């Protein structure tokens, strides 16, 4: 969403800031969860989760069909030369939707919201909306999920249910990059904590060192105010 003006961004061994890299390929391996849930109000919980997987799978299906149509056309003019084989297509739109729905319902059950599958976001609490937003990201099977202040828009009593889900994801080995002011959560879950101020990284360390022996004066000042 931002154009870097320097440095590198290495993801799975590839510098995705390189102009030669197809960034869209790597975007499909990343999930994002924002402080505002951004669920579609005109779609049910399960439909919100299904939307991206169905859209991308159907787009890939259309591309395969177009390629096969082109192969059929070119084969008409190959004369005695060997015909090109059609690309295998092992699914259709109905199967794509059925698989996406099955996965979405499984994810809702995982977070205890299977009874909310067919309800609209307007009937959900803030914590429930954010949990649906998180599993909507999981539905794409990402390698990494980026969280931007996922609890900042929630009422205090709803923060815990979202953090518990994120702790469970961390326990399962999901790679997460989290922007947060929840220092207790960061101390418990993170394997590296980075402190930024005015767009600059001032300190980066494992949690025990970050919270136990901070070095930068600005970090010391920050921790003295937020850790009570």
Question: Which ranges hold each PLM region?
Answer:
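Catalytic Walker B motif of ABC-type/P-loop ATPase nucleotide-binding domains
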Residues: 145-148
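Conserved ABC transporter NBD signature motif
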Residues: 7-14, 18
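Conserved signature/switch motifs of ABC ATPase nucleotide-binding domains
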Residues: 119, 140, 172
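H-loop/switch region of ABC-family ATPase nucleotide-binding domains
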Residues: 180-181
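ABC ATPase NBD coupling module
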Residues: 16-31, 93-101, 171, 213-214
